[in-house]
Amino acid sequence: MNKSTLALAVTVGVLAQQAGAAGFLEDSKASISSRTMYYDADMREGASTPANRQRETAEGLKFDYLSGFTQGTVGFGIDAQALVGIHLDGGKGHHPTGNSNSFFPSDGNEAADEWSRLDGNVKARFSKTEAHLGGALAPNLPILIANDSRLLPQTFEGGTITSKEIDNVTFNFGQLEHASGRASSNSTGLSVAGASQDSNKFLYGGADWKVTKDLLLQYYYANLEDFYKQNFLGLVHVYPIAANQSFKTDIRYFDSSSDGKNGDPGFQFNNNNGFAKNPGEVDNKTWSAMFTYTLGGNAFLIGHQRVNDDGGFVFLNQGNLVDSNGNPEGAGGASFYSFTDATVGSFIRAGENTTFGQYSYDFASLGVPGLKASIAYLNGQDIKATNGVGKDLSEHETDARIDYVIQTGALKGFGTTLRHGTYRGNTSTLDQDQTRLIFNYTYSFM
Protein backbone atom coordinates (compact mmCIF):
# COMPACT_ATOMS: atom_id res chain seq x y z
CA MET A 1 0.00 0.00 0.00
CA ASN A 2 1.57 3.33 -1.01
CA LYS A 3 1.64 6.40 1.20
CA SER A 4 -1.31 8.15 -0.44
CA THR A 5 -3.54 5.06 -0.18
CA LEU A 6 -2.64 4.64 3.51
CA ALA A 7 -3.31 8.31 4.19
CA LEU A 8 -6.66 8.00 2.46
CA ALA A 9 -7.65 5.01 4.61
CA VAL A 10 -6.80 6.88 7.81
CA THR A 11 -8.67 9.97 6.65
CA VAL A 12 -11.77 7.95 5.74
CA GLY A 13 -11.88 6.71 9.33
CA VAL A 14 -11.63 10.23 10.72
CA LEU A 15 -14.16 11.76 8.34
CA ALA A 16 -16.61 8.90 8.81
CA GLN A 17 -17.47 10.49 12.16
CA GLN A 18 -18.46 13.67 10.30
CA ALA A 19 -20.15 12.01 7.34
CA GLY A 20 -23.53 13.20 8.47
CA ALA A 21 -22.45 16.81 8.19
CA ALA A 22 -24.34 18.73 5.54
CA GLY A 23 -22.34 18.90 2.34
CA PHE A 24 -20.03 15.92 2.82
CA LEU A 25 -22.55 13.38 1.57
CA GLU A 26 -25.08 15.68 -0.08
CA ASP A 27 -22.49 17.04 -2.48
CA SER A 28 -20.80 13.69 -3.11
CA LYS A 29 -20.42 12.29 -6.61
CA ALA A 30 -19.68 8.71 -7.62
CA SER A 31 -19.26 7.30 -11.11
CA ILE A 32 -17.84 4.35 -13.01
CA SER A 33 -16.32 4.87 -16.44
CA SER A 34 -15.63 2.27 -19.09
CA ARG A 35 -13.17 2.73 -21.94
CA THR A 36 -12.64 0.04 -24.56
CA MET A 37 -9.76 0.75 -26.94
CA TYR A 38 -8.37 -0.88 -30.05
CA TYR A 39 -4.84 0.39 -30.67
CA ASP A 40 -2.90 -0.28 -33.88
CA ALA A 41 0.56 1.21 -34.45
CA ASP A 42 2.09 0.10 -37.75
CA MET A 43 5.73 1.14 -38.21
CA ARG A 44 6.39 1.49 -41.91
CA GLU A 45 10.14 0.88 -41.58
CA GLY A 46 12.18 -2.08 -40.34
CA ALA A 47 11.41 -5.75 -39.75
CA SER A 48 8.02 -7.06 -38.65
CA THR A 49 8.54 -7.28 -34.88
CA PRO A 50 6.24 -6.59 -31.89
CA ALA A 51 7.92 -3.19 -31.53
CA ASN A 52 7.15 -2.40 -35.19
CA ARG A 53 3.56 -3.67 -35.35
CA GLN A 54 1.62 -3.23 -32.14
CA ARG A 55 -2.01 -4.30 -32.30
CA GLU A 56 -3.95 -4.66 -29.05
CA THR A 57 -7.43 -4.34 -27.56
CA ALA A 58 -8.13 -3.69 -23.89
CA GLU A 59 -10.85 -2.63 -21.47
CA GLY A 60 -10.34 0.03 -18.81
CA LEU A 61 -12.61 0.59 -15.82
CA LYS A 62 -12.34 3.66 -13.61
CA PHE A 63 -14.30 4.25 -10.40
CA ASP A 64 -14.34 7.78 -8.97
CA TYR A 65 -15.76 8.97 -5.67
CA LEU A 66 -15.66 12.70 -4.90
CA SER A 67 -17.07 13.73 -1.54
CA GLY A 68 -18.40 17.14 -0.67
CA PHE A 69 -16.89 19.15 2.19
CA THR A 70 -17.78 19.03 5.87
CA GLN A 71 -19.31 22.11 7.47
CA GLY A 72 -17.24 24.73 9.27
CA THR A 73 -14.79 27.49 8.48
CA VAL A 74 -12.51 24.85 7.01
CA GLY A 75 -14.28 21.98 5.26
CA PHE A 76 -12.69 18.59 4.69
CA GLY A 77 -13.35 15.84 2.17
CA ILE A 78 -11.93 12.84 0.34
CA ASP A 79 -11.57 11.63 -3.24
CA ALA A 80 -10.98 7.99 -4.17
CA GLN A 81 -10.09 6.40 -7.49
CA ALA A 82 -9.80 2.74 -8.52
CA LEU A 83 -8.42 1.73 -11.93
CA VAL A 84 -8.57 -1.69 -13.58
CA GLY A 85 -7.18 -2.62 -17.00
CA ILE A 86 -8.14 -5.90 -18.69
CA HIS A 87 -6.30 -7.14 -21.77
CA LEU A 88 -8.69 -8.52 -24.40
CA ASP A 89 -6.61 -9.28 -27.49
CA GLY A 90 -3.16 -8.87 -29.02
CA GLY A 91 -1.10 -11.88 -28.01
CA LYS A 92 2.37 -12.94 -29.07
CA GLY A 93 3.81 -10.93 -31.90
CA HIS A 94 1.76 -7.79 -31.33
CA HIS A 95 2.77 -6.57 -27.85
CA PRO A 96 6.07 -4.69 -27.52
CA THR A 97 7.79 -4.94 -24.15
CA GLY A 98 9.86 -2.54 -22.08
CA ASN A 99 9.61 1.21 -22.40
CA SER A 100 8.54 0.95 -26.05
CA ASN A 101 5.02 0.07 -24.84
CA SER A 102 2.82 2.42 -22.84
CA PHE A 103 -0.57 0.96 -23.79
CA PHE A 104 -0.65 -2.08 -21.49
CA PRO A 105 1.91 -3.51 -19.01
CA SER A 106 3.95 -6.58 -19.86
CA ASP A 107 4.31 -9.98 -18.22
CA GLY A 108 7.49 -11.43 -19.66
CA ASN A 109 7.26 -11.22 -23.44
CA GLU A 110 3.47 -10.91 -23.47
CA ALA A 111 0.87 -8.49 -22.25
CA ALA A 112 -0.29 -8.94 -18.66
CA ASP A 113 -3.83 -10.28 -18.28
CA GLU A 114 -4.84 -7.33 -16.12
CA TRP A 115 -3.54 -4.57 -13.87
CA SER A 116 -5.04 -2.32 -11.23
CA ARG A 117 -4.31 0.70 -9.08
CA LEU A 118 -6.00 2.34 -6.08
CA ASP A 119 -5.33 5.91 -5.04
CA GLY A 120 -7.03 8.88 -3.49
CA ASN A 121 -6.75 12.41 -2.15
CA VAL A 122 -7.72 14.23 1.01
CA LYS A 123 -8.88 17.79 0.53
CA ALA A 124 -9.67 20.94 2.45
CA ARG A 125 -11.53 24.13 1.54
CA PHE A 126 -11.30 27.55 3.12
CA SER A 127 -13.30 30.35 1.53
CA LYS A 128 -12.42 30.15 -2.19
CA THR A 129 -9.21 28.16 -1.72
CA GLU A 130 -8.87 24.38 -2.00
CA ALA A 131 -5.94 22.13 -1.12
CA HIS A 132 -5.61 18.52 -2.32
CA LEU A 133 -3.09 15.98 -1.01
CA GLY A 134 -2.72 12.44 -2.34
CA GLY A 135 -1.89 10.20 -5.26
CA ALA A 136 -4.84 10.73 -7.59
CA LEU A 137 -3.95 14.23 -8.78
CA ALA A 138 -4.42 15.03 -12.47
CA PRO A 139 -3.12 18.56 -13.18
CA ASN A 140 -4.12 20.29 -16.40
CA LEU A 141 -1.84 23.31 -16.57
CA PRO A 142 0.51 24.80 -19.18
CA ILE A 143 3.55 23.41 -17.35
CA LEU A 144 2.05 19.97 -16.63
CA ILE A 145 -0.76 17.95 -18.23
CA ALA A 146 -1.73 14.52 -16.90
CA ASN A 147 -1.84 12.15 -19.87
CA ASP A 148 -5.14 10.38 -20.66
CA SER A 149 -4.62 9.36 -24.28
CA ARG A 150 -4.66 5.58 -23.85
CA LEU A 151 -6.70 3.16 -21.73
CA LEU A 152 -6.45 4.71 -18.26
CA PRO A 153 -5.14 8.05 -16.96
CA GLN A 154 -1.74 9.02 -15.65
CA THR A 155 -1.90 10.39 -12.08
CA PHE A 156 0.48 12.23 -9.75
CA GLU A 157 1.21 12.13 -6.03
CA GLY A 158 1.80 15.30 -4.05
CA GLY A 159 -0.10 18.39 -3.02
CA THR A 160 -1.87 21.17 -4.91
CA ILE A 161 -3.53 24.46 -3.97
CA THR A 162 -6.05 26.34 -6.11
CA SER A 163 -7.24 29.77 -4.98
CA LYS A 164 -9.87 32.12 -6.41
CA GLU A 165 -9.86 34.69 -3.60
CA ILE A 166 -9.27 37.52 -6.10
CA ASP A 167 -12.04 38.05 -8.64
CA ASN A 168 -11.13 36.87 -12.15
CA VAL A 169 -7.77 35.44 -11.01
CA THR A 170 -7.05 31.76 -10.35
CA PHE A 171 -3.80 30.89 -8.57
CA ASN A 172 -2.33 27.38 -8.82
CA PHE A 173 0.52 26.05 -6.70
CA GLY A 174 1.83 22.57 -6.07
CA GLN A 175 4.60 20.16 -5.19
CA LEU A 176 4.57 16.72 -6.80
CA GLU A 177 6.75 13.76 -5.85
CA HIS A 178 5.68 10.72 -7.88
CA ALA A 179 3.80 9.73 -11.02
CA SER A 180 1.82 6.61 -11.91
CA GLY A 181 1.99 5.83 -15.62
CA ARG A 182 -1.06 5.30 -17.80
CA ALA A 183 -0.15 1.59 -18.07
CA SER A 184 1.40 0.98 -14.66
CA SER A 185 0.22 -0.27 -11.27
CA ASN A 186 3.08 1.38 -9.38
CA SER A 187 4.52 4.87 -9.10
CA THR A 188 7.95 6.30 -9.94
CA GLY A 189 9.84 9.49 -9.33
CA LEU A 190 9.70 12.32 -11.87
CA SER A 191 12.09 12.71 -14.79
CA VAL A 192 12.68 13.81 -18.39
CA ALA A 193 13.11 11.93 -21.67
CA GLY A 194 16.38 10.02 -21.80
CA ALA A 195 17.14 10.12 -18.08
CA SER A 196 17.44 6.95 -15.99
CA GLN A 197 17.43 8.82 -12.67
CA ASP A 198 14.50 10.68 -11.13
CA SER A 199 13.55 13.48 -8.77
CA ASN A 200 10.96 13.67 -6.01
CA LYS A 201 10.48 17.41 -6.18
CA PHE A 202 8.51 19.18 -8.89
CA LEU A 203 7.45 22.64 -7.75
CA TYR A 204 5.13 24.93 -9.67
CA GLY A 205 3.14 28.11 -9.27
CA GLY A 206 1.27 30.52 -11.46
CA ALA A 207 -1.94 32.33 -12.26
CA ASP A 208 -4.69 32.67 -14.86
CA TRP A 209 -6.00 36.23 -15.07
CA LYS A 210 -9.30 36.78 -16.84
CA VAL A 211 -8.69 40.42 -17.77
CA THR A 212 -12.03 40.63 -19.58
CA LYS A 213 -14.56 37.98 -20.58
CA ASP A 214 -12.65 37.69 -23.88
CA LEU A 215 -9.01 37.98 -22.71
CA LEU A 216 -6.98 35.54 -20.59
CA LEU A 217 -3.36 36.12 -19.49
CA GLN A 218 -1.24 33.36 -17.92
CA TYR A 219 2.10 33.00 -16.17
CA TYR A 220 3.56 29.82 -14.65
CA TYR A 221 6.90 28.75 -13.21
CA ALA A 222 8.00 25.14 -12.73
CA ASN A 223 11.14 23.47 -11.37
CA LEU A 224 11.97 19.77 -11.56
CA GLU A 225 14.86 19.53 -9.11
CA ASP A 226 18.14 18.44 -10.75
CA PHE A 227 16.63 18.62 -14.23
CA TYR A 228 15.10 21.92 -15.35
CA LYS A 229 13.49 25.28 -14.60
CA GLN A 230 10.72 26.58 -16.85
CA ASN A 231 8.81 29.84 -17.31
CA PHE A 232 5.59 30.06 -19.30
CA LEU A 233 3.66 33.06 -20.65
CA GLY A 234 0.31 32.71 -22.39
CA LEU A 235 -2.37 34.87 -23.98
CA VAL A 236 -5.79 33.76 -25.19
CA HIS A 237 -8.21 36.23 -26.78
CA VAL A 238 -11.57 35.58 -28.40
CA TYR A 239 -13.00 38.32 -30.60
CA PRO A 240 -16.76 37.91 -31.13
CA ILE A 241 -17.45 39.01 -34.70
CA ALA A 242 -21.15 38.24 -34.79
CA ALA A 243 -23.61 35.60 -33.67
CA ASN A 244 -21.99 32.15 -34.17
CA GLN A 245 -18.83 33.81 -35.51
CA SER A 246 -15.55 34.51 -33.69
CA PHE A 247 -11.78 34.84 -34.07
CA LYS A 248 -9.50 33.31 -31.42
CA THR A 249 -5.83 34.11 -30.81
CA ASP A 250 -3.69 31.76 -28.68
CA ILE A 251 -0.04 32.68 -28.04
CA ARG A 252 2.36 30.62 -25.88
CA TYR A 253 6.00 31.04 -24.85
CA PHE A 254 8.24 28.67 -22.86
CA ASP A 255 11.75 29.39 -21.55
CA SER A 256 13.53 26.35 -20.06
CA SER A 257 17.01 25.97 -18.56
CA SER A 258 19.17 23.42 -16.74
CA ASP A 259 18.95 22.80 -12.98
CA GLY A 260 21.22 21.02 -10.50
CA LYS A 261 22.61 17.67 -11.68
CA ASN A 262 21.15 17.97 -15.16
CA GLY A 263 23.78 16.82 -17.65
CA ASP A 264 25.42 14.38 -15.24
CA PRO A 265 25.17 10.63 -15.96
CA GLY A 266 21.62 9.46 -15.33
CA PHE A 267 20.30 13.03 -15.30
CA GLN A 268 20.78 13.73 -19.00
CA PHE A 269 17.95 15.01 -21.20
CA ASN A 270 18.05 13.39 -24.65
CA ASN A 271 16.62 16.56 -26.24
CA ASN A 272 13.95 14.40 -27.89
CA ASN A 273 16.66 12.49 -29.77
CA GLY A 274 17.74 15.68 -31.49
CA PHE A 275 20.55 18.25 -31.40
CA ALA A 276 21.69 20.00 -28.23
CA LYS A 277 24.26 22.77 -27.96
CA ASN A 278 25.20 21.28 -24.59
CA PRO A 279 24.43 17.55 -24.88
CA GLY A 280 22.38 16.17 -22.01
CA GLU A 281 21.36 19.60 -20.73
CA VAL A 282 18.12 21.57 -20.94
CA ASP A 283 18.41 24.83 -22.90
CA ASN A 284 15.31 25.81 -24.84
CA LYS A 285 12.98 28.60 -25.86
CA THR A 286 9.78 27.70 -27.71
CA TRP A 287 6.95 29.91 -28.89
CA SER A 288 3.76 29.22 -30.79
CA ALA A 289 0.84 31.19 -32.17
CA MET A 290 -2.55 29.80 -33.22
CA PHE A 291 -5.49 31.54 -34.82
CA THR A 292 -8.97 30.01 -35.10
CA TYR A 293 -11.87 31.39 -37.11
CA THR A 294 -15.24 29.90 -36.15
CA LEU A 295 -18.37 30.26 -38.26
CA GLY A 296 -21.38 28.23 -37.18
CA GLY A 297 -20.24 24.61 -36.96
CA ASN A 298 -17.03 25.32 -38.92
CA ALA A 299 -13.67 26.02 -37.27
CA PHE A 300 -10.53 26.88 -39.28
CA LEU A 301 -7.23 26.84 -37.37
CA ILE A 302 -3.77 27.83 -38.56
CA GLY A 303 -0.62 28.19 -36.50
CA HIS A 304 3.15 28.12 -36.26
CA GLN A 305 5.60 26.88 -33.63
CA ARG A 306 9.29 27.68 -33.36
CA VAL A 307 11.79 25.70 -31.26
CA ASN A 308 15.12 27.49 -30.85
CA ASP A 309 18.42 26.02 -32.07
CA ASP A 310 20.03 25.26 -28.69
CA GLY A 311 17.99 22.22 -27.62
CA GLY A 312 14.63 20.45 -27.61
CA PHE A 313 11.50 21.36 -25.68
CA VAL A 314 11.37 19.72 -22.23
CA PHE A 315 8.48 18.42 -20.11
CA LEU A 316 7.89 15.76 -17.44
CA ASN A 317 8.47 12.33 -18.99
CA GLN A 318 9.17 9.13 -17.04
CA GLY A 319 9.50 6.92 -20.13
CA ASN A 320 13.18 6.00 -19.70
CA LEU A 321 13.23 5.20 -15.98
CA VAL A 322 14.51 1.81 -14.83
CA ASP A 323 14.01 -0.09 -11.56
CA SER A 324 16.70 -1.21 -9.10
CA ASN A 325 17.47 -4.20 -11.33
CA GLY A 326 17.93 -2.06 -14.42
CA ASN A 327 14.65 -3.17 -15.98
CA PRO A 328 12.28 -0.67 -17.63
CA GLU A 329 9.67 0.75 -15.26
CA GLY A 330 7.10 0.92 -18.06
CA ALA A 331 6.09 4.43 -16.99
CA GLY A 332 5.97 5.94 -20.49
CA GLY A 333 3.28 8.22 -21.83
CA ALA A 334 3.35 11.99 -21.32
CA SER A 335 1.60 15.10 -22.60
CA PHE A 336 2.67 18.70 -23.06
CA TYR A 337 0.87 21.98 -23.76
CA SER A 338 1.16 22.33 -27.52
CA PHE A 339 -0.96 21.71 -30.60
CA THR A 340 2.00 19.73 -31.97
CA ASP A 341 1.46 17.02 -29.33
CA ALA A 342 -0.12 15.07 -32.16
CA THR A 343 -1.33 11.48 -32.61
CA VAL A 344 2.17 10.19 -33.45
CA GLY A 345 4.78 12.96 -33.55
CA SER A 346 5.70 15.81 -31.19
CA PHE A 347 7.55 18.32 -33.45
CA ILE A 348 9.73 19.71 -30.64
CA ARG A 349 13.37 19.12 -31.64
CA ALA A 350 16.00 21.85 -31.76
CA GLY A 351 15.59 24.30 -34.64
CA GLU A 352 12.20 22.97 -35.69
CA ASN A 353 9.73 25.28 -37.41
CA THR A 354 6.28 23.72 -37.57
CA THR A 355 3.36 25.11 -39.52
CA PHE A 356 0.04 23.46 -38.82
CA GLY A 357 -3.62 23.75 -39.68
CA GLN A 358 -6.89 22.08 -38.80
CA TYR A 359 -10.46 22.07 -40.04
CA SER A 360 -13.18 20.83 -37.70
CA TYR A 361 -16.95 20.66 -37.95
CA ASP A 362 -19.65 20.34 -35.30
CA PHE A 363 -22.64 18.62 -36.88
CA ALA A 364 -25.00 20.12 -34.30
CA SER A 365 -25.35 22.92 -36.84
CA LEU A 366 -26.96 20.37 -39.17
CA GLY A 367 -29.23 18.99 -36.48
CA VAL A 368 -26.94 16.11 -35.41
CA PRO A 369 -25.73 17.07 -31.91
CA GLY A 370 -22.88 14.99 -30.53
CA LEU A 371 -21.21 14.36 -33.89
CA LYS A 372 -17.90 16.10 -34.57
CA ALA A 373 -15.09 15.59 -37.09
CA SER A 374 -11.69 17.14 -37.77
CA ILE A 375 -8.61 16.82 -39.94
CA ALA A 376 -5.21 18.35 -39.17
CA TYR A 377 -1.86 18.65 -40.93
CA LEU A 378 1.52 19.46 -39.35
CA ASN A 379 4.76 20.15 -41.25
CA GLY A 380 8.04 20.47 -39.36
CA GLN A 381 11.13 21.85 -41.12
CA ASP A 382 14.68 23.00 -40.23
CA ILE A 383 15.24 20.31 -37.58
CA LYS A 384 18.92 20.43 -36.67
CA ALA A 385 20.84 17.21 -37.28
CA THR A 386 21.95 15.45 -34.11
CA ASN A 387 25.60 16.28 -34.81
CA GLY A 388 24.69 19.90 -35.51
CA VAL A 389 26.42 20.03 -38.90
CA GLY A 390 24.48 17.67 -41.14
CA LYS A 391 21.56 18.48 -43.40
CA ASP A 392 18.45 19.78 -41.65
CA LEU A 393 15.73 17.18 -41.14
CA SER A 394 11.96 17.36 -41.61
CA GLU A 395 8.75 15.55 -40.66
CA HIS A 396 5.03 15.82 -41.36
CA GLU A 397 1.82 14.27 -40.06
CA THR A 398 -1.85 14.09 -41.02
CA ASP A 399 -4.40 13.38 -38.29
CA ALA A 400 -8.11 12.74 -38.66
CA ARG A 401 -10.75 11.99 -36.06
CA ILE A 402 -14.49 11.61 -35.72
CA ASP A 403 -16.41 11.63 -32.43
CA TYR A 404 -20.01 10.82 -31.64
CA VAL A 405 -21.78 10.93 -28.27
CA ILE A 406 -25.36 9.65 -27.96
CA GLN A 407 -27.52 12.50 -26.67
CA THR A 408 -30.72 10.79 -25.48
CA GLY A 409 -32.15 7.44 -24.41
CA ALA A 410 -30.79 4.57 -22.34
CA LEU A 411 -27.29 4.96 -23.81
CA LYS A 412 -27.12 8.72 -23.34
CA GLY A 413 -23.46 9.71 -22.93
CA PHE A 414 -22.05 6.67 -24.72
CA GLY A 415 -19.24 7.93 -26.93
CA THR A 416 -17.29 6.58 -29.89
CA THR A 417 -14.02 8.02 -31.21
CA LEU A 418 -12.06 6.97 -34.28
CA ARG A 419 -8.59 8.49 -34.73
CA HIS A 420 -6.01 7.93 -37.43
CA GLY A 421 -2.56 9.45 -37.77
CA THR A 422 -0.03 9.14 -40.59
CA TYR A 423 3.53 10.25 -39.80
CA ARG A 424 6.46 10.50 -42.22
CA GLY A 425 9.91 12.03 -41.86
CA ASN A 426 13.66 11.47 -41.86
CA THR A 427 14.16 11.92 -38.09
CA SER A 428 14.75 9.20 -35.49
CA THR A 429 10.96 8.73 -35.24
CA LEU A 430 9.95 5.82 -37.47
CA ASP A 431 7.35 6.38 -40.18
CA GLN A 432 4.08 5.19 -38.72
CA ASP A 433 0.37 4.72 -39.36
CA GLN A 434 -1.63 4.69 -36.15
CA THR A 435 -5.31 3.93 -35.57
CA ARG A 436 -7.32 4.13 -32.36
CA LEU A 437 -10.95 3.08 -31.94
CA ILE A 438 -12.35 4.06 -28.55
CA PHE A 439 -15.69 3.46 -26.81
CA ASN A 440 -16.39 5.53 -23.68
CA TYR A 441 -19.26 5.42 -21.22
CA THR A 442 -19.69 6.92 -17.74
CA TYR A 443 -22.48 6.00 -15.34
CA SER A 444 -23.06 8.32 -12.37
CA PHE A 445 -24.40 6.83 -9.13
CA MET A 446 -24.75 10.10 -7.24
Model-identified regions with their sequence ranges:
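Transmembrane beta-strand segments that form the barrel wall of outer-membrane beta-barrel proteins
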Residues: 36-38, 131-146, 171-177, 205, ...
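Outer-membrane beta-barrel translocator/channel fold
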Residues: 172-192, 244-340, 418-437
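Repeated loop/turn-to-beta-strand initiation elements of outer-membrane beta-barrel proteins
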Residues: 73-75, 128-132, 168-172, 180, ...
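C-terminal structural cap/anchor segments
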Residues: 302-389, 397-400
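Solvent-exposed loop/turn segments connecting transmembrane beta-strands
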Residues: 126, 138, 151-153, 179, ...
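Surface-exposed coil loops of outer-membrane beta-barrel proteins
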Residues: 93-113, 119, 130-209, 218, ...
